Amino acid sequence: MKRRACAAAIAAAGLLAGCAWFRPPKKASFWEGRIAIKDPGDPQNNMSASFELQGNASAGSFGLFNMLGLTLASMRWGEGFAELQSGGETHTFKSADAMVRSSLGHSVPLAAVFGWLNGSDANVPGWEVDRSRYAERRLRARKTAASESGVDQAGLELLLVWDAP
């Protein structure tokens, strides 16, 4: 009887210790793949590139590369700074969103992109997200309303295809 009680106590302790070590998987903080932006109002503003995105909306980096792997733009941001390196020049911005706008030529909701890549259902006013192919690591976001500045028109599409982590 004592043996059973002792064995049960050891088994219970083992289970509790096992639970203490279990940690749910963290959301990804690094993605690489392809990005495309389609502007139906001005096809000359369409763009496509490979990308590497790391971090989160508060601090991170975003690199764009041509089909030969050469760097088109390298962006970094953190608390109080946003920096874009492109064409041998470095530019600073007040926000990561302004930096991304300058680099891509379009306003893209950076904070939402991190959420979308992590599978979040985050809704952004003026954007409609198609998550139907998320399991295939494909995402399409479409601008449903023109920006207040008038720079981005409704119909602009952001397409992301990323590799498995």
Where are these regions (language model features)?
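Post-signal-peptide N-terminal segment of Sec-exported extracytoplasmic proteins
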Residues: 36-74
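Mature, soluble, non-transmembrane domains
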Residues: 21, 91-96, 101-165
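N-terminal export leaders
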Residues: 2-8
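Short beta-strand segments that buttress and anchor functional surface loops
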Residues: 35-39, 62-65, 139-150
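Bacterial N-terminal signal peptides
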Residues: 11-14
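Bacterial Sec signal peptide processing site at the extreme N-terminus
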Residues: 17-34
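An acidic-aromatic
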Residues: 59-109
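Short, hydrophobic/aromatic-rich segments at coil-to-beta transitions
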Residues: 28-32, 57-61, 134-141
